[in-house]
Amino acid sequence: MALWGGRFQQEADAKFKFFNDSLRFDYRLALQDIDGSIGWAKAITAVGILTEAECAKLVDALKTLRAEIEPNIAIILRDAAEDIHSWVESKLIEKVGDLGKKLHTGRSRNDQVALDMKMWCKVQVIVLQQCIRNLQHKLVATAEDNQQTIMPGYTHLQRAQPISFAHWCMAYYEMLERDYTRLTDAYQRMHTCPLGCGALAGSAYPIDRDQLAQDLHFEIATRNSLDSVSDRDHLLELLASASISMVHLSRFAEDLIFFNSGESAFLELSDRVTSGSSLMPQKKNPDACELIRGKSGRVFGALSGLLTTLKGLPLAYNKDMQEDKEGIFDAVETWQACLEMATLVLEDINVNVVRTSEAAQQGYSNATELADYLVAKGIPFREAHHIVGETVVYAIQQRKPLEALSVTEFKQFHSVIDQDVYAILSLPSCLAKRSAKGGVNPSRVKEAIEVAKQHLAS
């Protein structure tokens, strides 16, 4: 039975019922809906709507219902209820009879669903932050194992300056740390309880909403009933956090796809996270990484979709808001899966240290060091930059790396270049010179790893 049937003389069309019903996706809110109902039962008992005995009976029934479905809430999908609120109420009435019909006194599905979604989001934030931490741990461990692994760093997908694979790992650690703190910030703004605001104008009963908020583990009650039932900022923030993080994960995946390719051969991904071709028996495809990269689009789409849904809505609640759920459910599930898969990808990664070192020695990635060498000899940087550019052109024509040029050849471009130039052109020297905080100097990278380990352990 619908919760709103008294006003209507005809049954809803079956097509409309399917179009309108939301149980097939909002069943995920079952535990939150039950917990919110327990809190509401206590709140209306405090103002005399229920007796203590009635409250105890309702709470016991709700707890029993929770225990029945918690192992597998998908069993709810066998039911034909309109939404999760209708389902919980109908099951409660089955257990306690007409007493169950009293529970909704003073409550609207508008403040009820706003509560459910905030409670659900809070749970997801905790899960997602743990997934981020797991990936960070794996990145730090991989970095620690590869502090001596020198590889080319890229700009414009061209070899630019040598870095270490450890430094690359720590770059993504930092991105994920920002993802983690974005969730922490969003979580704080989820800590306001909308229950007790009714449909839009507040409750007709003297509900102690501050106590209700505490009972439901919120910091405070919301301050404006109209805003409370209309607000979906917490969903937008969670989707925005997911989208930014998926950008990071997509770039991480793209780097690994490139590093794994035959053209780079910097590393090999495990058989556990790759697949083959139905036609070409030699293929080993980086499907895990490609799917992470591809799934970013559906998360971005969920954010774009909800922004578009909300942008023209008048206050307060409109049925359009039902469209907030499928996108957020899918986006959060996708984000979590991608975080877990990225962690798995790193577990058995095999870095080819010989190949990465060879690649770092190619492409004149030590040219900047030669420019800095000239600056140290008193040449203005802009002039030094030009001199090195001409030197690189010559080296390319001679098919030699810079370090293979003779002193005589170097002196064609400036007389200050001498035998001491060779020491600064070596790969270890290139890394050692970048000793400012955040640079690729091995001691700085080790320091960053230690700081990260301490942070993750705290």
Curated annotation (Swiss-Prot):
GO biological process, one term: L-arginine biosynthetic process
EC number in record: 4.3.2.1
Catalysed reaction, written as an equation: 2-(N(omega)-L-arginino)succinate = fumarate + L-arginine
Subcellular location per the Swiss-Prot or TrEMBL entry: Cytoplasm
Domain of life: Bacteria
Pathway: Amino-acid biosynthesis; L-arginine biosynthesis; L-arginine from L-ornithine and carbamoyl phosphate: step 3/3
Keywords: Amino-acid biosynthesis, Arginine biosynthesis, Cytoplasm, Lyase
A GO CC annotation given for this chain: cytosol
Any matching Pfam family: ASL_C2
EC category: lyase
InterPro entries (alphabetical): Arg_succ_lyase_C, Argininosuccinate_lyase, Fumarase/histidase_N, Fumarate_lyase_CS, Fumarate_lyase_fam, Fumarate_lyase_N, L-Aspartase-like
Main localization category: cytoplasm
Gene Ontology MF terms: argininosuccinate lyase activity
Family recorded in the similarity comment: Belongs to the lyase 1 family. Argininosuccinate lyase subfamily.
HAMAP family: Arg_succ_lyase
Protein name listed in UniProt: Argininosuccinate lyase
Organism: Haemophilus ducreyi (strain 35000HP / ATCC 700724)
